[in-house]
Amino acid sequence: RGRIAIDARFDLHGHTQHSAHAALLRFIERARADGCRHVLIVTGRGGERGGVLKHSVPRWLQEPAFHRHVIAFHEAGPRHGGTGALYVVLRRPRG
């Protein structure tokens, strides 16, 4: 029914904002090099304020370091974490 398989998942729970940025970039680079096209990034929903990573990750994915690997991203469906996760579509690997 139009569902796309998730090739890889990355959970940012337990990361600080600083460590999450570096770890996410490494994950995205590795996933793309491995030929993954559709990945799931779990940010968590955060507390009452909505969570730092939940708001930071979409901004990061638009930075040049990430954008060179990322085609698009959007909020995950309920079965994959809903507002606490993102589907990310990666560019095809080079070569």
Please provide the spans of the model-predicted regions.
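Long, charged, low-complexity intrinsically disordered regions
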Residues: 1-38, 43-95
